[in-house]
């Protein structure tokens, strides 16, 4: 059980100066990266476009989790790398739906693949949380459902500026305004961090790492 001092510290760190600066940097990255991807040199080359787009998803996932955990913490960077992997790996469902490893087939699908349904996110997160509770992994891996939520949500929000959000079984929304994508992406780590505090996850993470968390 976390002490009152740990609880107070975790609450104060949800909006520290460092994390606010980091999230502003994340917003700026979104602005610049997605504008650069519009260059004709990238758009005219399928491989370059696909790899660049996926790389941006990866960086946003890594950056978002770094904001949550604190970029100055003395733990391994494996979590941040894992967050980037989770944010980018979603796109493999393009190849599953295409039934082929052909990039051309993956980019010309008749419909959106299943991992791009936003309803999947809470289902997978809650299933993961239940599984961790069942196998008593909830302390050592308490961060994993939150990491998955942030990584996948950031991917869906970014895709939403082109295609809208696909919310099964209700259909899809209109494409998201670019400014809304930037605001949601840069504020999502803080929202999750605060909810993690309310659920006690931040305190468990602080105890696990043995250092302060700078968010």
From Swiss-Prot:
Q: Which domain of life is it from?
A: Eukaryota
For this UniProt record, give its keywords in alphabetical order, as a comma-separated list: Membrane, Transmembrane, Transmembrane helix
Q: Mind telling me which residue stretches traverse the membrane in this protein? A: 77-97, 114-134, 178-198
> Topology with regard to the membrane?
Multi-pass membrane protein
Task: Tell me if Manganese is a UniProt keyword of this record.
Answer: no
Where does the UniProt annotation locate this protein?
Membrane
Predominant place of localization: membrane
Instruction: Return the GO cellular component terms, semicolon-separated.
Output: membrane
- Which InterPro entries does the record match to this protein? TMEM267
Give the protein's recorded name.
Transmembrane protein 267
Organism source for this protein? Homo sapiens
